[in-house]
Amino acid sequence: MSPANTMSLALSSADSTLDAKAARRLARLLNPAPAFHAHLPGGAERARVEQYIAARFREVHGANIHDFMPVLLTMGCHGRTTAATGVRAAVRQPLFLEQYLSGPVEQVLGTAAGEKIRRANIAEIGNLVATQGGSSYLLFMVLTAILEQAGFDWVVFTATPQVQKVLAYLGLGVHRLCSADPGRLSESSAAEWGSYYASQPQVVAGKVADAMAVLNQRALYSSVLSLFRGQITELAEVLRRESSRRGSYILAA
């Protein structure tokens, strides 16, 4: 059965409270169905993906970013990238967003969540961009499933109001950790970020299991994730292997 036909079945069987606008948005993104890929340092397409991310940050924020996360994930169709994000395991090195925090991420997050959290179970995401309407919604859904299969319990990131809107639309709750204060940057200057900080981004964290529970409760979202089950499994294994490697990378937002 083709992805488009599968999507039609998912729409017809979705619960009655499903937002029709969300259904139409996802239907457009799935016809034709996009593909998801991981790009590691030194990979054949890595430079192109970095250029795509940098160009989008420059276009939207007037920013000049030049450092990127260890694992870059892309979403695209027919060779055209429509969204991308980066992932870094906290166990590998200090996180970029820890510059904003008052202490190690596992301690700050543990206090906010009211539970003991192991650093090895935390992933940071960043370098998030999209060039097609709605792409970020689907990317977040698939990324959540990838993180779960890769063994991460928590995800942390710096969220602009637009990213917060995506999370709210999907029904994904987060813990607010602090404001992203550019005055605390040591790895890059605020000037390099253009207008990025004018939107007052927030450092937030989400529990992966809770996010997956929300996605699985919605018939449409669950059906969409099932379409990409094979890709999710493959990308989770890439992320798991890369997270266990020794060494470190330059910090990148």
Where are these regions (language model features)?
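Generic alpha-helical secondary structure signal
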Residues: 43-47, 51, 137, 161, ...
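N-terminal short leaders/motifs
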Residues: 13-33, 75-81, 97, 153-162
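Conserved N-terminal entry element of GNAT/NAT acetyltransferase domains
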Residues: 1-44, 225-226
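Active-site/ligand-binding-proximal alpha/beta "capping" segment
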Residues: 221-242, 253
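A conserved beta-strand-loop-helix scaffold within acyl/acetyltransferase catalytic domains
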Residues: 32-120, 126, 203, 207-211, ...
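Intrinsically disordered, low-complexity acidic/polar segments
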Residues: 94, 134, 213-215
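Accessory, usually C-terminal, subdomains that scaffold auxiliary metal cofactors
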Residues: 181-231
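Acyl-donor binding region in acyl/amide transferases
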Residues: 101-188, 194-201
